[in-house]
Regions:
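Short, charged beta->alpha transition segments
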Residues: 96-98, 119-131
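Alpha-helical membrane-targeting segments
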Residues: 75-111
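Active-site mouth loops of central-metabolism enzymes
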Residues: 12-23, 107-122, 247-251
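A short alpha-helix capping/helix-coil boundary motif
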Residues: 5-9, 35, 104-105, 135-138, ...
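Non-cysteine beta-strand/loop elements that form the S-adenosyl-L-methionine
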Residues: 67-71, 93-102, 214-221
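N-terminal binding-site loop/beta-alpha segment at the start of enzyme catalytic domains
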Residues: 1-89, 163
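Short, flexible segments with low predicted structural confidence
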Residues: 4, 27, 99-101, 111, ...
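Beta/alpha (TIM)-barrel catalytic core signal, keyed to glycine-rich beta->alpha loops juxtaposed to Asp/Glu
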Residues: 23, 30, 44-48, 125-137, ...
Length: 319
């Protein structure tokens, strides 16, 4: 991102509202910053609507230079904001209610897709700036339906967003197929993409790079960790080939996580890779993917090739 320098790893705050009290949330963000991870990804939808305010409160007294992405397009479901605070004490006392409680909490995390009306995007950006207590560095459309993403009204408000200083860069998150067409059609406002790139769902990031579009990728761990564990456990041949061609012991799950992040960083060398954790020690392990990498470029290429050659079906959760 030639106009903006952001850290190679970014910390996603989609689950921060459920990660404990404010002191713990502050510790997570502080751990990330101390480890050199200074880009943070939030949205009005994240944390049941609380993620932006939590991050803003934490960063208010932060002396370091950090960057922030926020979004427009998804909102938290319209349920009481203190649902989890009510449910958790009940969960502790009445174990038989656990299944019902989990369903209620999961429902509270379902997004409401925002129907666009003129002025909505700018109003959302203003609300985000108040919660964050700073302008966003990057402002993305958040998985918006195609008809809105390509409308003149939305494109016009994104232009206005940059003019008013609410964001340095604008872009869009979503599926690779949609992003390709939208970025080519409106490169001035869709100059940043956010999309999945993982072992199980690889993206052609070269297309965006050659088009002058910056990429922020996510779901590397979610789209790789379980699949690799499945192959190591249930397909002995995979482990044998891995040992011969990659030569790295990943029986330690923390090492496996670092390897997955290193692959994601290798495949998005000009961009940023997002991850998330509610454990400070895991954040430090993630940072090692940048500071003390375990893999060479040849090993990264070998992992992608090996996975594509051997992996034929998604993990069978019946095992």
């Amino acid at each position: 991102m030639s106009e903006l320098r952001i850290s190679r790893l970014g910390f996603g705050l989609s689950g921060i509202a459920g990660s404990g009290n404010f002191i713990h949330q502050q510790r997570l963000v502080r751990t990330a910053i101390d480890a050199g991870i200074t880009h943070f990804d939030v949205a009005p939808f994240y944390g049941s609507g609380d993620a932006e305010k939590i991050l803003g409160d934490i960063l208010r007294d932060c002396p370091e230079q950090v960057t922030v992405t926020t979004k427009f397009g998804l909102l938290p479901a319209k349920v009481p904001g203190k649902l989890r605070a009510i449910v958790r004490p009940v969960l502790r006392r009445v174990k038989g209610l656990k299944q019902l409680a989990v369903k209620l909490i999961n429902y509270s995390h379902r997004p409401d897709i925002q129907c666009f009306k003129p002025g909505d995007l700018l109003a959302s950006a203003e609300a985000s700036m108040r919660k964050l207590q700073r302008p966003a560095n990057i402002f993305l459309l958040h998985d918006m339906v195609r008809v809105h993403s390509e409308s003149e009204a939305v494109v016009g408000e994104l232009h206005q967003l940059k003019k008013t200083g609410y964001a340095a860069l604008t872009g869009i998150s979503g599926s690779e197929a949609d992003l390709r067409e939208l970025c080519l059609a409106h490169p001035a406002v869709y100059s940043v993409t956010q999309l999945e790139n993982s072992l199980s769902n690889p993206a052609d990031l070269g297309f965006f790079k050659s088009s002058g579009i910056s990429s922020i990728t996510h779901r590397a761990i979610m789209g790789g960790f379980e699949h690799l564990n499945f192959l190591f456990r249930f397909r002995p041949g995979f482990g044998q080939i891995w040992e011969r061609e990659i030569g790295l012991d990943v029986s330690n799950q923390d090492v496996l996580m670092q390897v997955i992040l290193e692959l994601a960083l290798f495949e998005n060398q000009a961009g940023t890779v997002l991850f998330s954790s509610t454990r400070p020690e895991r954040i430090k392990i993630a940072a090692a993917a940048v500071q003390k990498p375990l893999l060479t470029e040849v090993q990264c290429e070998g992992i992608r090739r090996l996975f594509q050659d051997v992996y034929q079906h998604p993990p069978d959760r019946r095992h």
